[in-house]
Each structure stands twice: as structure tokens, then as C-alpha cells.
């Protein structure tokens, strides 16, 4: 994967601004002129809407801004992405923040997109959930596992946040998030989460 030098931040096909890295590997961001005239601040405390270049601090987001860090996979998504990269001969540790945002591209769950879009996920229909659940167990049980499940989970939306294995799938023209058990979850974790969701609706 060729290193990315600059990222365009997009919101509903509008250019919000551009990201680059300083020589100290700190994120530098600048709003586009058009966005300054008719847009809004995407991070009021860190990135108020005005002209000029903003330079991130080294902490707490490893030289990035929180609004972009939120767009990156964590937990399960990060595990799958890094395993996927390794299987394709790419050392995840060599990737910059810009490289990782390009891998999110247009497939993140938030409103922001990133170009160039180097994402490798794709919309797919209903699948064999039982087989995917077994693959998730194999992946979580071994740091060296290199089966087809790595590609399958990455293609089916490896970037959502959270610790548990999950995929996005389409069924009857609707998008669904399907979650699987983590290593130490009880067998009825799905039923428990469903009950909690019903309680949340009542609140």
C-alpha cells in the first residue's frame, strides 16, 4: 500500500477540509474555503470554524484529532483490519493515521468520508451466520489464525467499533448489524442484549 500524503475530508459530497501530517507525525487540518463560508465546525473545541491550519497535540489521540479518531476502527474492527493487512503482506505498524483513514474511506458509520478511498468492505446479502460465528471464535482463539474468516469479516464491514465480532448484512433490502459472541460472553448474550434494547426503547 502506497503511503498517503493528504486526505480529503468529505461530508455529503462536500469538501470539509484536508488532512496532512507534520514532520513530527502530528495531524494538520485546514477547512476548505467553501466550507468556511457555508459549513459548520466538525469539532467545536478542537477545530472551530475559521481559516488557518490546526495542529493536533501528541495526546490523547496519538497525534490526531478526536473527531477523526472516532472514525477509525477499534476493538474487533481493528483486530480484523490488522489481520487482513498482515495476510496481504502489509505491516500494520507501518501505516500512518492518513493511511488508516483512507482504509475507512466511505465505509465508516459516521457522516464523514475520506478520500482517496482505499476501503475494502462491500455490501453483501444474508450469509451463513453459524459459520461466521465459528470463524469469529477461531479468530479470537489464535493470534496466528489465517483462515477465510479474516477476509469475510473485513469485506462485511470490519470497521464498526466495539469489542464483539460483528458484520453488516442486507436482508429484504434493509441493512442489519449482526453481532456474535466474544470469547468470554455467556451463551445467551444475544437474548440479553435484545432485552436491554427493549428496555432502552421504553426509557
Cite the ranges covered by each PLM segment.
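Phosphate/dinucleotide-binding and metal-coordinating scaffold of catalytic cores
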Residues: 1-203
Amino acid at each position: 500500500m502506497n503511503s498517503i500524503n493528504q486526505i480529503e475530508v468529505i461530508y455529503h459530497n462536500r469538501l470539509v477540509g484536508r488532512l496532512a501530517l507534520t514532520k513530527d507525525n502530528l495531524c494538520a487540518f485546514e477547512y476548505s474555503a467553501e466550507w468556511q463560508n457555508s459549513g459548520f465546525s466538525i469539532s467545536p473545541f478542537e477545530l472551530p470554524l475559521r481559516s488557518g491550519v490546526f495542529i493536533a497535540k501528541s495526546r490523547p489521540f496519538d497525534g490526531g484529532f478526536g473527531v477523526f479518531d472516532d472514525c477509525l476502527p477499534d476493538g474487533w474492527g481493528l483486530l480484523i483490519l490488522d489481520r487482513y493487512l498482515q495476510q496481504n503482506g502489509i505491516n500494520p505498524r507501518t501505516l500512518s493515521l492518513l493511511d488508516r483513514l483512507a482504509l475507512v474511506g466511505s465505509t465508516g458509520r459516521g457522516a464523514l468520508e475520506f478520500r482517496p478511498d482505499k476501503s475494502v468492505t462491500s455490501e453483501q446479502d444474508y450469509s451463513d451466520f453459524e459459520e461466521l460465528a465459528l470463524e469469529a471464535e477461531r479468530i479470537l482463539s489464535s493470534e496466528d489464525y489465517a483462515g477465510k474468516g479474516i477476509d469475510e469479516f473485513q469485506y462485511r464491514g470490519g470497521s464498526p467499533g466495539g469489542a464483539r465480532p460483528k458484520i453488516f448484512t442486507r436482508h429484504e433490502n434493509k441493512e442489519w448489524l449482526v453481532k456474535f459472541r466474544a470469547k468470554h460472553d455467556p451463551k445467551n448474550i444475544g437474548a440479553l442484549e435484545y432485552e436491554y434494547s427493549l428496555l432502552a426503547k421504553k426509557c
